[in-house]
Amino acid sequence: METSNILDFETRTFYKTITIGRGRRQQLVNSSGRFCVAFRMEGTRSQLCYRIWKELIPDAVQRYKMIGERISRTQLEYFSGFRYVPSALRMKCDGSILPGIVMEWIEGKKLDAFMTEEWATLSDVQRLTFIRDFYYMCHLLRKNGIAHGDLSCMNILVTPERDIRLVDYDSLFVSEMGRNFYQTTGGAPAFQHPDRTNASYPMLTSLEDDNFSQLVIALSLWVAYFDPSVTQNYDDSNLLFLPGDISGETGSERLRNLKDSDGWKRAEKVATKFGHIPILMKGLESIQYSVNQVPSLLKFVNEEVIISADFYRLLDSADRNVSSMQPVPYCTACGQKFENDEFKFCTACGTKRHTYTVSSSFIPYRHEQSM
């Protein structure tokens, strides 16, 4: 991509493409998906992602207008701000003009790379914090009427600070869409119900699009929490399961493939250690039914549990109740994460930090002192 072919004035004027290699081996830093090619560009103070549509998404302008307004209004930290560019690039070969979007470049590792390269180096508390952050993201997306539509290792980045960021918004659902738009993709095969990946007819997009992928990722994280060695099998943009593990022509075949998989067997080995794991596995057994019957992760956990300092114990569930007053780890107004228990006001919006009473199931466990 030559800079002279970039039609967006601001990008062409203040940014340049980033290349790797030398001479004839020199090439642009880019990544490619089904619909877009994304180029990394560098300015004096920032970097951006210049995404060019190689295949136009149906109703792209309407979709991105709704998506942009929703992201701007909610200000969720998981998304990058962007703007739609109807005339983004002139093709050198034939002069045709392609649309695209300009967005902030997010620095981070894909989820599978983070798991294989860093997970084993984290403490138990750091792993638990990351899992809770994933659950909180799922909660906030649903609370704000958003489904990503293609949650997978390719589209979940982990920053150097271990914050979660989402990329590739072509498949996003926002509540303004209602039941008027079709899904743009079936998603990554190792994360999606077969009804989506093998759909023989267009499926309407909805708030439920992330249900199956959230269960897959949640189970993968918990299995890795108890058995960090499993992350060495998380490669090629897959986690606990491979595409063949989540496939089949009939419900019974799908369930059999899932339960015969190495990932399922790894989950069974640690299932007795934590009461939430069998619940997630039961949720994934919905693979034998239609995609409309897949439960949301949020059916099994609510906001009070996620923000609780007793997150682990509440999910593990036991018989004896213990009540305690706890400060919330996230601002209830804007969602900003408090760095430690000393902060009494949100540093982002100034809202006073709330506390709440937890009546939880108490089981002594290895994080009791460090949490």
Kindly give the residue locations of the regions a language model identified:
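Juxta-kinase regulatory segment immediately upstream of eukaryotic protein kinase catalytic domains
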Residues: 1-29, 62-63
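ATP-binding glycine-rich loop module of kinase domains
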Residues: 24-28, 34-81
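Conserved activation segment of eukaryotic-like protein kinases, specifically the C-terminal portion
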Residues: 180-196
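Helical subdomain adjoining the active site within ATP-dependent kinase catalytic cores
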Residues: 223-325
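Short Cys/His-rich micro-motifs in 6-15 aa windows
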Residues: 329, 348-360
